[in-house]
Amino acid sequence: MVIRIYADDREKASGIPELLKELGITVIFSQLTVADYVITDDVAVERKSVNDLVNSVFDKRFFDQISRLSEVYRFPILLVEGDINDIRKITEKWRAINNALISATIDYDVKVFYSRDKKDTAEVLKKIAEKFQFGENKSNRISLHNKAKLESVSDIQLYIVESFPNVGSILAERLLLKFGTIQNICNASISELEKALGSRKKAEDIYKILRTHYSKTNLDNDSKKTTSLFDFL
């Protein structure tokens, strides 16, 4: 059983990726524009120390990050690291932090987890990965081939866009609202796709797929290399 977790390059300095490796986890670094850790196609984690949590709320980064996290991933997670009681020591406006966490849960459907320290964070990430990569939740994904009858043009458009790698129903709707038509999505640049997708790698993958000529050779090679959508990350 090999657990793989994608980590943002900026997380190297935290030391958590090394702790994950000590737990037997394969860590793959990438430039993530949304989230700090990607567990599966649908699950991602934004890690914040207590200090960073407080600062991000007051400098307006918090809700932008949480909003993008919930738009890109079906199961977004905020992991708060450190003693939550320290918030009262850091700021007199601690109620604003509590309200932000409540809003993240209720308004953005973000799950909020807590860890004592970096070592505990690594343990929490491992447990999340075990649940979603190998546990009962592994099969809890939307299958593109088990949908109800498509009765409208909008349904068909969503169906087509959802077939792109790492694009679920929420992100498919976001792409269509941003670009208007499937043709415009196909004509978009990598930078334009990245802004909508929240990931440079995903944008490059979709851009390549849309512009690569179909051939039996490509199909055979891809079937040997790729076993799941997670491999496209």
Swiss-Prot record:
Entry's Gene Ontology molecular function annotations: ATP binding; DNA binding; endonuclease activity
SUPFAM superfamilies: Restriction endonuclease-like (SSF52980), RuvA domain 2-like (SSF47781)
A Pfam family it matches: ERCC4
InterPro entries (alphabetical): DNA_repair_endonuclease, ERCC4_domain, Restrct_endonuc-II-like, RuvA_2-like
Activity regulation information from UniProt: Nuclease function requires interaction with the PCNA heterotrimer. Inhibited by SSB, even in the presence of PCNA.
Membrane-traversing stretches: none
Cofactor(s) demanded: Mg(2+)
Domain ERCC4 residue range list: 8-127
One of the GO BP terms on file: DNA repair
Gene3D superfamilies linked to this entry: 3.40.50.10130, 5' to 3' exonuclease, C-terminal subdomain
Domain of life of the native organism: Archaea
Keywords: ATP-binding, DNA damage, DNA recombination, DNA repair, DNA-binding, Endonuclease, Hydrolase, Nuclease, Nucleotide-binding
PANTHER family: DNA REPAIR ENDONUCLEASE XPF
Entry function: A structure-specific endonuclease, cleaves 5' of ds/ssDNA interfaces in 3' flap structures, although it also cuts bubble, Y-DNA structures and mobile and immobile Holliday junctions. Cuts preferentially after pyrimidines, may continue to progressively cleave substrate upstream of the initial cleavage, at least in vitro. May be involved in nucleotide excision repair.
Subunit structure: Interacts with PCNA heterotrimer via PCNA1 and PCNA3.
Designated name of the protein: 3'-flap repair endonuclease Xpf
Lineage: Archaea, Thermoproteota, Thermoprotei, Sulfolobales, Sulfolobaceae
